[in-house]
């Protein structure tokens, strides 16, 4: 993978242009490679970020990548060989106390080509976005909502609340809408102390699909996700930390095919706690 990321800052404006060439070599014809591994020379970011009055309030326009919160729903992958990019706008405001709100209105960029033969051959095709796939969101962060109020452990509490909306249309999906509402709270690790993270997410939506025989089916989407982590960091030079984790994500019930219950990770990373899982096809 070869990546070039250039930025230029002038008078409250930040121009950014990033290109990347991600290829494969020596893969077998029956390999599991896809657009998550290969994306021949393409533009990942081409944006301008404007300061609106001050750097505490900004507006980003163009193509960009982003990380939000735990990165479970929106992320710029670290281990995966290709990125998630969006065409649109991102508005961010940070208050003097550190509280932040971000609003985005985008069209997710589809990595092309998608067919396996082209991926294995490292074929080139411009990535593109479409009005048939739209992604919106609002994300709020409170870095220390209880600072100075508890006089102890929970002064370090950090909370997040957010809502995302994904709408899609295609040849087989006449209309699909998924709303994602989530809350997250954490106390980050420090030597000699316990830490924790808890996140809960609800998804609700509906879809209309066109079957191969021309029939139209309608169903709803109802999914949930929950995460809990409790850890302890020892006050030793090695920074030893032990932790207990629970992950839960709903799945489809084969008895009710008209209802989609599999949790949709949107544009997040998969099992990032375990490193480069893409090596194993996870």
Model-derived segments and spans:
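Low-complexity, flexible helical/coil segments
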Residues: 2, 6-7, 11, 53, ...
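Small/polar (Gly/Ser/Thr/Ala-rich) solvent-exposed segments
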Residues: 62
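C-terminal structural cap/anchor segments
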Residues: 240-282
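Short, solvent-exposed loop/turn segments at secondary-structure junctions
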Residues: 21-24, 66, 108, 249
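Surface-exposed loop and membrane-interface regions of Gram-negative outer-membrane beta-barrel proteins
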Residues: 1, 7-56, 68-76, 121-125, ...
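Short, Lys/Arg-enriched charge-dense amphipathic segments
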Residues: 37-44, 81-87, 97-101, 181, ...
